[in-house]
Every structure is written in structure tokens, then in C-alpha cells.
């Protein structure tokens, strides 16, 4: 009797799953970078049943699935930001010449509890803006990022899917230059200081035990001059890979990036200065580049809030350097995944700086279809979630957004996402605006 009761309940639950039929104006295929017309997406619960021509949808399907008419919009996978700091905020103000001062202030005056609440607000905003998955890379105290992810998974608050690193593994000093010797212990609240290869492997075990699903290392400690050694990074990579966990490296100089790639990391974050030889090695070893560039609007706002004059020549040189690096990487075939490094308070709506990283790629001459692939298909590969998200296809999670049809020629359409679905649940619906 209990078996039949269980079977009946299972059948009833299956029947109660919400079913949606999405009619897309255009559908962005993140694998091929093509915009397709006349397509429909059928969803049951949180899983995509099928993607097919709208004309092939059966009468039974039209009857049983709730229609979501997105025929005036472009439908695409939810955006993925591979480099976030949801629990970190740096406030800009004139005459602040002490790099790292805001991090010290955050540790002393904010603490993990406030930062977790701040992160919760940002996580909600990210999701509502169409960013359905993130990789959060440290600067979150002692595993407050893991706690935030737990709350999202338990349904306590809305937010994107999260990969979490916990404290980044760093050489002496972390990213807090000027901290006097007496107060070096403060740095350990934000970074895991690595002392040698054996300690480096132990640090990996600590983070994995606490719930980290990616390991963030600092190949160099910009703005501090200290660096991890190749042997220390190799020890980290070997230990992380034993547990099936990826390692991605903060590396702002070519030397730091090259050393990290030699050590076997899976990703390079920032990579502002990359020689062709380093890019070639990245292609050979399949290392992903996450360029955390800002667009011209963000750069202008940064200078304004910092009390600096806007120098057109300086801005042009800065943007040209970023353009050169990403263009060379793209032409060589380096796998590029989108990431923002969004932690500065630009006095913009939460999540807008993340979108502006994508706009920066456009300003550097990358075609829009490639940019959308960076933020979906490639980003999912970088997070090792490419069998469940990043593409709209059968069996994948229903993480779907819709933007204006102008997206093919207007990258700014990403700033105004009109529809968001995560896990088969409608989060944002602004179709009538």
C-alpha cells in the first residue's frame, strides 16, 4: 500500500510542476553565436524539455504549457559573471591615496555580518538584472561568501548560482600594503597567507573543507609587491585538482600570469599585461582568461569620485592597452570568459558595473555575439557548469533572460534586461515597459 501511495504522490508532484512555453522573437545560440528566429522553449519545473521551431509546437503542448510571449524580444541564457566580490565594497573619495585603506576599514568597522547582508542585497540585484550565476572570488572575510551561497540554496533569499572561493591564497601582506607589522594579523581575516609549498597544500584543504568550490590565488599581490612562488602555486594546483576543484589566479603582470600558467592554473584573472608568449602558452594549456575591464563610463566615474581630472589622452592610452591585450588574446584563440571584478561603489545601481565589463569588451572591438558567448557559454565552461547552464538546450537548467531585439547591434541593451528566469521561476518581468 505504501508503495502505491508513494507512486501516486510522485505522480501528483510531477503533475504540479509548472510548465512554460516561451515564444522567442529571436533566440541567441551561445554555442554557435547565432541569432535564430521562430523558436520556442518548453520548460517543466526547472529543466528545459526541448528547444524547437515554434511552428512544431503541438496542440497538446500549447494547451498544457503556460505561454510566455517573448516574441518582441531576444531570448538568451542567463548572464554569468566569473569574477565578483558580492561582499566587498570600496568607497571612492577625493585625496584617498592610501591603497588598501578601504579594505582595512571594512574589516574593522563592517565585519562579516554586515558584509553578508550587503552581499545579500547585491545578490538579489544581480539576479533581478539577469546575472543568474557568479564566481565569487574572495574578499568576503572568513567564508561569508559560502554562508551567502548556503542561504541562497536554502531559499532564504534570492540570488544567482554561486561558485565560492573563500579567502584567497596569498603571499605575505595580501593586498593590504602599508599595514604595519604589529597589525599583520588583521590581514588573516581576509586572506589565507601561504608560507611554503606544504602550507599551500594545507590551505587548499582548509578552504575545500569549509565549502570552497574554486580556489583563488594571488600570483602577485597588486598593489603589494609580494608574489607566490611557482612551487607554491604548483602545490596549490596539485592539491586542488586532487579534489576536482579548479584554481584561478589573480595576475596583473605578465610575469605573474606566466608563472601561474606554468604552475598549472585553470584561469587567469585580470591579465592586464600579457605577452604573446604567455597567451600562446594559455592556448596550449587551455587556460581561460577573465578580463575584468571597465568601460569608458566606469573609468570617467572612477576619476570623478576620486577627485581626479578627466584626461582624455590618459583615458585613450588606458583603453588602448586593454583593447590590444583582449584583441590579441581573442585572435590567438584564448578562451575568454566574462568577469567584472565589481567591488567599487560607482554610485550606480547594483549589477550595472558587471554589465559595463561587457560593454568594455565592445569598446575594445570585440563583436557582440562573441561578447554574449563570453558571458554565457564560455563562462559556464570556466565554472565547470557547462553541462547545466550557459546554453539553452534540452536537459539544461531553465536560466533564461530576454532583452530588446536591438542587442545584435546595441550592447547597451544588456543594461535593461526585460525578463529573467532562474531555475524555471520567473524573477523579473518588465515586458510591458
Could you say what each language-model-derived stretch is?
Residues 1-18:
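Bacterial Sec-dependent N-terminal signal peptides
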Residues 18, 32-76:
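Histidine-rich, glycine-flanked metal-binding segment
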Residues 73-150, 154-156, 260-263:
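Metal-associated gating/positioning segment near the N- to mid-region
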Residues 108, 112, 119-145, 159-167, ...:
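Divalent metal-dependent hydrolysis catalytic cores, especially in the metallo-beta-lactamase
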Residues 138-142, 146, 153-259:
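Histidine/acidic-residue-rich, glycine-tolerant segments that coordinate divalent metal ions
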Residues 172, 217-323, 337, 342-347, ...:
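Active-site core of metal-dependent hydrolases
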Residues 242, 320-406:
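His/Asp/Glu-enriched, well-ordered alpha-helical/loop segment
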